[in-house]
């Protein structure tokens, strides 16, 4: 006979006593109007459904796995902290992620440019129809590593939807990143599929606020990947922000980057000038 019994139970009463609420699991159809896309919606603890909230997406589309948390996490890349500033913060797995079906994952093959973004956009628009307090006319996006590439990609290729991006340690051009990883998803020989998804090649398209962040000693993605985008943006006469973290490795930006990210989205999505950090007690 099969016997099932709980081995342990998490006690979250102290979190709940502080006003913490778990993110909502939300499902909506993707780009094809048929396939379910699953994600999370995080709200501030002082949430008021009568207000309008800018939306920020945390992206890590990979590929190679599912990335939206399936287990209890009180803290995921500071989604909840960002929400406390007065944002709705979301994360969704789009087509190209793993463990759904071969066809679902193969959307990304020789097509990392896609980044699941058409599904993410459809999902957020569906969420906003159900929850009108989600203002999808003010959407920002942030990510690190592949997410850094994808968040920059979002404002370059979908500027009508994504209005600002914070991109950390991005592998912005797959022709210069780890060969084994890139050939796994983009194939060999190197062809147009590499060029089409390159933020270096597409840098001239920038029309939205962008903050690029890089760790000086990144030993996962060469910092030159970010600097190539910087060079292309300068040549294209584009305005942007660059933050280099001395001594940092592959990072979302460490404590200094957290400050910069919070301020960046407050400025560009709320149109508010945040206080100086060194004056906050």
List the model feature ranges, each with a label.
Residues 1-281:
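Serine-hydrolase catalytic core recognition
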């Amino acid at each position: 006979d099969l016997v099932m019994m709980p081995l342990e139970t998490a006690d979250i009463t102290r979190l709940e006593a502080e006003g913490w609420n778990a993110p909502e699991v939300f499902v909506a159809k993707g780009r094809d109007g048929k396939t379910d896309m699953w994600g999370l919606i995080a709200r501030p603890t002082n949430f008021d459904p009568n207000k309008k909230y800018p939306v920020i997406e945390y992206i890590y589309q990979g590929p190679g796995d599912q990335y939206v948390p399936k287990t209890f996490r009180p803290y995921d890349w500071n989604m909840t902290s960002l929400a406390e500033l007065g944002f709705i913060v979301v994360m969704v797995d789009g087509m190209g992620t793993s463990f759904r079906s071969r066809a679902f994952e193969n959307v990304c093959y020789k097509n990392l440019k896609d980044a699941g973004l058409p599904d993410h956009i459809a999902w957020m628009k569906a969420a906003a129809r159900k929850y009108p307090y989600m203002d999808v006319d003010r959407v920002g996006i942030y990510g690190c590593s592949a997410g850094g590439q994808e968040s920059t990609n979002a404002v370059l290729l979908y500027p009508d939807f994504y209005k600002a991006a914070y991109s950390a340690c991005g592998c912005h051009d797959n022709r210069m990143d780890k060969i084994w990883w890139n050939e796994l998803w983009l194939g060999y020989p190197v062809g147009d599929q590499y060029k089409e998804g390159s933020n270096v090649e597409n840098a001239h398209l920038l029309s939205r606020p962008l903050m690029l962040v890089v760790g000086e000693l990144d030993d996962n993605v060469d910092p030159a990947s970010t600097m190539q985008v910087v060079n292309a943006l300068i040549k294209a006469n584009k305005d942007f922000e660059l933050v280099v973290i001395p001594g940092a490795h592959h990072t979302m930006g460490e404590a200094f980057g957290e400050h910069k990210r919070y301020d960046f989205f407050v400025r560009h999505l709320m149109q508010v000038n945040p206080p100086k950090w060194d004056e906050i007690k």
